[in-house]
Amino acid sequence: MTATSTGPSRPIAFATRYASTGRWPFITMVNLRVDPASEAADRIEKTLRAPLPRQFGHTTVSGPHTIAWLGPDEWLVLSQADETAVAAELREALGGDPGLVADVSANRTTLELSGPAARQVLEKGCPLDLHPRSFGPGQAVSTTVGPVAVLLRQVDDVPTYRLFPRSSFAV
């Protein structure tokens, strides 16, 4: 097993030939609630340069932003951009319309599991069907891994998964 730390914005990782784990610090996370049929939602989509996903498990990606569907009127914006700027731009787009823009960057941490055995490792503690026909790249859902509630996102076909547990459960 190899351990590496590559600086404050790169993952801290442990690797074997079957899977690697890492922690990605400093991901901007903004919780967004808005009526998807509203003019405010249209303005937010223009600000993010991406549509808000409208279906369970879907995500959209544009530049530094990934938008994960959490519910019919709720999304989590994950971004490599500055948290203050992202939240401020989204608040401006929301304007005076009903809704919520909340910086929740300190609320969760980001763990990554990647490699040919990553799916099998997750299947040991996750009740979700992770078979590629059921869950694949570009999908994100709320689930549990062991006793810990997480937002689980599959990034690619390697497979690489990003897990977003609440900070109180972080390692």
List each language-model region with its residue ranges.
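Basic, glycine/lysine-rich polyanion-binding surfaces/domains
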Residues: M1-V171
